[in-house]
């Protein structure tokens, strides 16, 4: 009797250890257009939003966070308010002022092996504006090594122009070229950010063979969007994405976070949060 009991306890222990190891391989990724700090937002200004927004981020505690529209002081305030993260990314304007598409990496989970920023233009290595864009636009990236298993991956975070149709199309082509050049060994890649493009647009068709939209994959038929504009709790304008290399990852969960504590908008976008795992 005791031998049987000990045998089943042993099997249960092995199962629990295996389950715990599998879970430890997973990591969370979040993309968040935090809305720039601008006086015309009135009650929704950054000063009113930053404390609850930081509380939201620190509660979720993502392993990788990509933000858009972050001005230099917002990047600094986020970094100060998020212990245990390293920040990557610079502003898009002269002297690296202006909005950043920044990344925050949890240092207890990942080692940053490479990082940088390029401009979405014909001269990506220079501060510049591309095609018919209304603004300078950037993409910041990191190459990460997982401290738990040594696996490596890339993360690219971007914010496409809100006006220029050609700029949005060319931005995607440029980013895919940059990924190919920087990642010749085809390591797993995450591409995320505010694309200012809805899912049905033809420009995104180029991603369908090699990439997976994490939210769409696990929430087929969902009509919930990400751009709330500070005025609708259930938007249908989906423009914020987390894409992953199709063959490289398992997706465990993906959701749009719609918290609105005490009726306070945290941003004019909802963040997208996905939990993924690099395949063996």
Residue ranges and their predicted role:
Residues 64, 68-154, 252-256:
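Structured beta-strand-rich core segments of catalytic domains in phosphoester-bond hydrolases
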Residues 166, 170, 180-189, 197-280:
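Metal-dependent phosphoester-hydrolase catalytic domains
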Residues 31-51, 96, 120-134, 161-164, ...:
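Acidic/histidine-rich helix-loop elements
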Residues 34-37, 71-74, 92-96, 109-110, ...:
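Solvent-exposed loop/turn segments at secondary-structure junctions
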Residues 36-43, 67, 113, 165, ...:
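Short, solvent-exposed loop/turn elements at domain surfaces
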Residues 43-50, 67-72, 97, 135, ...:
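Solvent-exposed, acidic/flexible segments
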Residues 26-34, 53-78, 104, 142, ...:
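Active-site beta-strand/loop signature of hydrolases that rely on acidic residues for catalysis
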Residues 2-8, 20-81, 92-98, 279-280:
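N-terminal, active-site-proximal structural segment of metallo-dependent hydrolase catalytic domains
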């Amino acid at each position: 009797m005791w031998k049987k009991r000990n045998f089943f306890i042993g099997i249960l222990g092995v199962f629990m250890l295996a389950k715990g190891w599998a879970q430890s391989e997973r990591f969370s990724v979040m993309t968040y257009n935090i809305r720039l700090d601008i006086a015309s937002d009135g009650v929704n200004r950054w000063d009113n939003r930053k404390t609850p927004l930081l509380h939201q981020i620190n509660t979720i505690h993502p392993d990788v966070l990509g933000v858009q529209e972050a001005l230099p002081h917002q990047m600094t305030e986020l970094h100060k308010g998020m212990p245990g993260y390293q920040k990557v990314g610079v502003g898009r304007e002269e002297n690296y002022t202006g909005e950043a598409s920044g990344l925050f990496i949890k240092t207890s989970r990942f080692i940053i092996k490479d990082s940088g920023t390029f401009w979405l233009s014909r001269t990506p290595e220079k501060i510049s504006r591309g095609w018919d864009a209304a603004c300078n636009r950037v993409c910041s990236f990191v190459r990460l090594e997982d401290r738990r298993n040594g696996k490596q991956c890339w993360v690219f975070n971007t914010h496409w122009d809100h006006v220029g149709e050609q700029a949005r199309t060319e931005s995607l082509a440029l980013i895919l070229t940059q990924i190919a050049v920087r990642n010749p060994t085809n390591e797993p890649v995450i591409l995320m950010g505010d694309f200012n493009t809805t899912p049905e647009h033809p420009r995104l068709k180029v991603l369908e063979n090699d990439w997976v939209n994490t939210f769409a994959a696990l929430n087929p038929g969902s009509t919930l969007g990400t751009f709330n504009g500070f005025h609708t709790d259930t938007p249908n304008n989906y423009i914020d994405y987390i894409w992953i290399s199709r063959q490289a990852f398992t997706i465990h969960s993906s959701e749009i976070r719609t918290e609105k504590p005490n009726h306070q908008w945290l941003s004019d976008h909802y963040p997208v949060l996905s939990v993924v795992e690099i395949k063996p």
